[in-house]
Design a protein with these regions (language model features):
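Hydrophobic anchor at the beta1->P-loop junction of P-loop NTPases
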Residues: 7-9
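Walker A/P-loop
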Residues: 18
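Post-Walker A helix-loop "phosphate-sensing" segment adjacent to the P-loop in P-loop NTPases
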Residues: 25-34
Length: 191
């Protein structure tokens, strides 16, 4: 018998996944984020070496390799081939590490998984919450936090899974269309 119940929280960039996860954490549930694990994975020597070969412009340092994630982001969001190359390499590692951590926690565990559908990992979770938000709000949110211009944000949105065109009827869809209090209520009602 399983000791835990894994719940993925996913959605496009700027949809409010991290805010939803934060609300869930404030409600006392254990949470994990693939973004946190990504930062850990980027520190591993083997990963840095491989990324330095894949993205030579992102490599800094000679003795101790460092990788500039902003340079990688710029490259991958302007080239579908580079994005696929990066995703094919990193996503399985990040997902494996995240699931390994999640399985050590008993009870309900909420895991933020930005690329859930892109890496076809739906079957790894007992339940999936898809956070959706209107396009203009997503663009404004990402521009405010990331110092990107509208075209760059749209480039990233267009490189991701098409949540608006997909059949999400078998998942729990959380519409982030109001203020924080409204979102908190929706999260409480959903979980």
């Amino acid at each position: 018998m399983k000791d835990n119940y894994l719940i993925a929280v996913t959605g496009g960039i700027g949809s409010g996944k991290s805010m939803v996860l934060s609300i869930i954490k404030d409600l006392g549930y254990p949470t994990l984020s693939c973004d946190q694990v990504t930062n850990e994975v980027y520190k591993k020597h083997k990963v840095k070496s491989r990324l330095a070969k894949m993205f030579p412009n992102a490599k800094t340092g000679r003795l101790f390799i460092k990788i500039d994630k902003k340079i990688i982001a710029k490259e991958v969001f302007s080239s579908k081939q580079k994005l696929k190359q990066l995703t094919d390499f990193l996503t399985p590692i990040i997902l494996e590490q995240t699931l390994k951590k999640a399985r050590k926690i008993q009870g309900k565990v909420f895991v933020e998984v930005p690329l859930l559908f892109e890496c076809k990992a739906q079957d790894k979770f007992d339940k999936i919450i898809v956070v959706k938000r209107n396009l203009n709000s997503r663009i404004e949110s990402v521009m405010a936090r990331s110092n990107l211009i509208k075209e760059q944000v749209l480039e990233r949105i267009n490189s991701q899974f098409d949540y608006d065109g997909a059949d999400l009827s078998c998942y729990s869809v959380l519409l982030n269309d109001g203020d924080i209090k409204s979102l908190e209520e929706k999260v409480k009602n959903l979980i």
